[in-house]
Design a protein with these regions (language model features):
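Small-residue-rich segments within alpha-helical transmembrane domains of MFS-like 12-TM solute carriers
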Residues: 31, 35, 124, 128, ...
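Central cavity-lining transmembrane alpha-helices of secondary-active solute carriers
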Residues: 60-76
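Flexible cytoplasmic inter-helical loops of multi-pass small-molecule transporters
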Residues: 218-232
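C-terminal ends and interior cores of transmembrane alpha-helices
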Residues: 92-124
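Helix-loop-helix hairpin linking two adjacent transmembrane segments in secondary transporters
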Residues: 170-222
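Cytoplasmic helix-loop-helix junction between adjacent transmembrane helices
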Residues: 129, 135-172
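Extracytoplasmic
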Residues: 18-52
Length: 232
């Protein structure tokens, strides 16, 4: 009796490392967006009237929803819905939040009805900072959800293989985004005419690319699930 052994998708080193790169890019772009504004504090204070206190409150807004238990909810969603749904959801939240933040600091926001309304309450906190903080909150939810999703994804694709190496490499790729943005963000902002909007727009576009790379990964993961006999 001859036993036929089916080679699974993640048995191929090339395929599983390609999958890792696709999901790592999502995190790479996410980490770029997290720290994109850090080297631009003085510029946004000058161009949008923020104070150091306002900038500090904006920076902390990324974690507000997560402090109040969103990460627990994210874990429940991941267990119930799986890595494909949760990964696309998290990348979408990152892009949506980034888009809101982009609008908040853009020239189009200045003089708009939304700015007038946002400036009518909590007047010490500019409307642009309020909207940028809201976007950063939503982005932060997606970012932290993506973090646990990527960990579960690597555990699935690298089970019995180079799991620890894959986790370390994914984190290394993601953290390079922090290093890169401290060079890229000021360079983009200082191009004539100098503006904080340009690096925000650039990193928002990268998050859209990160969403698309994760969508590409979902097709690979669906094929792996079929090979494993799991529900597609």
């Amino acid at each position: 009796m001859t036993e036929i052994i089916q080679r699974k998708l993640n048995d191929s080193a090339f395929v599983r490392w390609t999958a890792l790169i696709l999901i790592a890019l999502t995190m790479f772009f996410g980490y770029m967006f997290v720290d994109m504004m850090s080297p631009l504090q003085s510029m946004i204070e000058a161009q949008r009237g923020w104070t150091p206190d306002v900038f500090g409150m904006y920076g902390s807004s990324e974690f507000i929803f997560n402090v109040f238990g969103f990460l627990i909810l994210a874990g429940i969603i991941l267990d119930k819905m799986g890595i494909r749904f949760t990964g696309v959801l998290s990348a979408s939240l990152m892009f949506i939040g980034a888009s809101i933040k982009y609008y908040g600091v853009s020239d189009a926001f200045i003089g708009s009805g939304i700015e007038t309304w946002l400036n009518s309450w909590w007047v010490s906190f500019p409307g642009s900072a309020k909207l940028a903080s809201l976007g950063f909150m939503i982005f932060g939810c997606g970012m932290e959800m993506a973090g646990i999703t990527v960990s579960k994804t690597i555990a699935k694709w690298f089970e019995g293989k180079e799991m620890a190496l894959a986790m370390g490499l994914e984190m290394a790729i993601a953290r390079v985004g922090v290093f890169a943005v401290f060079t890229i963000s000021p360079w983009l902002a200082n191009m004539a005419p100098a503006t904080v909007v340009r690096p925000v727009a650039f990193c928002t576009l990268l998050l859209l690319i990160g969403l698309l790379t994760y969508v590409v990964f979902t097709f690979m993961d669906r094929k792996l699930d079929k090979q494993l006999g799991l529900d597609a």
